[in-house]
Amino acid sequence: MPWTMDHPPASMRNLPPKVRRKAVEIANALLAERMDEAKAIRIATAKARAWALHEQRRREADAEP
């Protein structure tokens, strides 16, 4: 069953909303590829956190004069 923002895996509930949204998106894609749920959650959370950090750094670089 795919996860949603309203019903994410328990381990994603405390992530910031933007990170949780990305993690749910990634986890659902991994599940569609028949990955084990626990592994999909771990990978999706790590990738979503990395994505958020990259986005933050990109915005900061764009804001520099």
What spans do the regions from the language model cover?
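C-terminal alpha-helical interaction appendages
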Residues: 1-65
